C-alpha cells in the first residue's frame, strides 16, 4: 500500500518522504522561507491476525491485530504473510476459531513456511453492489484515496505553508505511525482523514 501511495502522490508534489516505520507523504513546498507545516494524514494499515501456535493437526491458533469483528471471521479466506511469500488459508470454527492451511500435521504446515508470529489478512475482493461497494480494509483505503485526491486538487495552488499529505502505518496497533510521522514532519497544524464503518 505504501508503494502505491507514493506512486499516486508523486505527480502532485515536490518530493516524497518516508518515516522510519514506512509512513509515506507527498510534500508540496511553499516558496516562503521557514514556512509553517501542515500535515494531512490518514492510515494505510489494516486489521489482521497473528499466529500464536501451530497445532499438531496442522491448524494454527491466532490473536487479532487491530479492530476485528469476530462474527465475520468464520469461513473467511486468508492470505498469510511468511518470510518466503504468501500462503492461502481460511478460518474454521465459531467459538474456538483456528486457521486451516489444508494440512494434516504441524510438520506439513511448517513446510509451507508458516511460523508463529506470521501475520494474516482477510482476502476479500472489491465488489460493486448497485450504488455501493464492499471490500476489506475499505475504511483505510478510502482515507488513502481522499489524501491523493486532496493533493491532486491543490497541485496548482500556492500556499504560504509546506503541505504534507499522506498515510501512516500502525494505526490499528496504537497509532504508532502517527507518532513517528509527526516526529518527522513536526507540523504546526495536523488534520486527520478517516471514515467510519457502515451501520449494521
Where do the protein language model's features map onto the residues?
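N-terminal hydrophobic/helix-forming segments and targeting peptides
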Residues: 1-200
